[in-house]
A protein has these predicted regions:
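Extended beta-strand/beta-hairpin segments
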Residues: 1-52, 62-144
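Alpha-helical metal-binding/catalytic segments enriched in His/Glu/Asp
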Residues: 57-58
């Protein structure tokens, strides 16, 4: 996973939101490894996004390693849970995740696959070791 990454989240005008918005639980997205994915997180807060990063990383890595091993996965589900406590700054209570996986392999091979992903998945590994987060720029456009 080495390399630079950029993601973006942005607001859209009310008319576009009214015309195109659907509940997140109803959205099925294309995926570069699975036939499609569905994200379940309501509401979509920063805490949900943190846990989604863990679940998404594990999900992706399951497909990557399965492909390397010649295993066809037929169903994958990763559920990440956790929370926050305290006043500002809040502190994470930790993130745990569960994996359900079905595929064209033995039970032992699938368990080994999950174990290897748990040891190698980048996002859980980064969180286990902590990482620096900094604000690198601000752009404002005043309207009054």
């Amino acid at each position: 996973m080495a390399g630079a990454f950029e993601v973006q989240i942005r607001s859209v005008p009310a008319d576009r939101a009214a015309k195109h918005a659907v509940a997140l639980s109803e959205v099925v997205l294309q995926h570069h490894r699975a036939d499609g994915i569905q994200i379940q997180a309501q509401p979509l807060t920063g805490g949900h996004l943190l846990h989604l990063a863990v679940a998404g990383c594990v999900f992706n890595d399951l497909y990557v390693l399965a492909e390397e091993r010649g295993i066809r996965l037929t169903e994958v589900r990763v559920v990440a849970t956790g929370g926050f406590e305290g006043e500002e700054p809040t502190v994470s209570t930790g993130v745990s995740y569960e994996v359900s996986v079905s595929g064209e392999a033995s039970e032992e091979e699938l368990r080994e696959l999950v174990g290897e992903v748990d040891r190698a998945a980048s996002i859980p590994d980064v969180l286990r070791q902590e990482t620096a987060v900094s604000l690198s720029g601000v752009q404002v456009q005043a309207t009054r």
